[in-house]
C-alpha cells in the first residue's frame, strides 16, 4: 500500500448508478457500526491513541470522526429531502478531531454510531428513485446528488475502518 491515507483508494463509482449499487451501499452503511466495532476489538488505550500513520489521527480520533462526519451527512440528507438544493455548512474536521470530546472512550461514539445508522438506514431504505436525484450544495465541492452521497458515505465508513485494520495488520495487533 503506497498511500496510508487511502488504504482502499479514493472514492470512485461507475456510471450510471444502479439500484443494485444503491442497495449495496446502504448495506455497507448499515454494516458499519459492527465493522468498526470489530476493527477496534480488544485494542488497549495505548493502541487506541496510536496514529494510523505518521501525522494522522489516532484510532480513537478516527472512531469519533466517523460519527461526526456521519451525523453531518444524516442532516445533509434530511435537508436535501425537505429543501431544494440546500447549501450545507462545511465543518473543519481536523479541528473537530482536536476538541476535548475526541478523547472520550470510543464506546461513546460507537453507541451513537449504532443509533444514528439505524435512523439513517431507515431513511435511506425509504427513498424513492426520484429522491436519489435530489441534491445539496457544498460551498467547496458543489452540487451532490443523494445517490452519489450514499456511495460516498459507504466508502467513507470502509475507508476509515481500513485505516484501523491496516494499522493492526502492519503492527501485528
Curated annotation (Swiss-Prot):
Keywords: Cytoplasm, Hydrolase, Metal-binding, Zinc. The keyword Zinc applies. It comes from the Bacteria. It is an enzyme of class 3 (hydrolase). Its cofactor is Zn(2+). The keyword tRNA processing does not apply. Zn(2+) binds at residues 65, 156, 160. It is found in: Cytoplasm. HAMAP family: YfiT_hydrol. Possible metal-dependent hydrolase. Belongs to the metal hydrolase YfiT family. This is Putative metal-dependent hydrolase BCE_2729.
Amino acid at each position: 500500500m503506497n498511500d496510508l491515507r487511502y488504504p482502499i483508494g479514493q472514492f470512485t463509482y461507475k456510471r450510471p448508478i444502479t439500484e443494485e449499487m444503491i442497495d449495496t451501499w446502504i448495506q455497507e452503511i448499515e454494516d458499519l457500526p459492527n465493522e468498526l466495532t470489530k476493527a477496534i476489538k480488544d485494542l488497549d488505550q495505548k493502541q487506541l491513541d496510536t496514529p494510523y500513520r505518521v501525522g494522522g489521527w489516532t484510532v480513537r480520533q478516527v472512531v469519533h470522526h466517523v460519527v461526526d462526519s456521519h451525523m453531518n451527512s444524516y442532516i445533509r440528507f434530511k435537508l436535501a429531502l425537505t429543501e431544494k438544493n440546500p447549501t450545507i455548512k462545511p465543518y473543519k474536521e481536523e479541528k473537530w478531531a482536536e476538541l476535548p470530546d475526541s478523547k472520550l472512550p470510543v464506546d461513546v461514539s460507537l453507541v451513537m454510531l449504532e443509533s444514528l445508522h439505524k435512523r439513517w438506514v431507515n431513511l435511506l431504505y425509504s427513498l424513492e428513485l426520484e429522491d436519489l436525484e435530489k441534491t445539496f450544495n457544498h460551498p467547496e465541492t458543489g452540487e451532490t446528488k443523494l445517490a452519489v452521497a450514499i456511495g460516498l458515505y459507504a466508502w467513507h465508513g470502509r475507508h476509515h475502518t481500513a485505516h484501523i485494520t491496516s494499522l493492526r495488520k502492519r503492527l501485528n495487533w
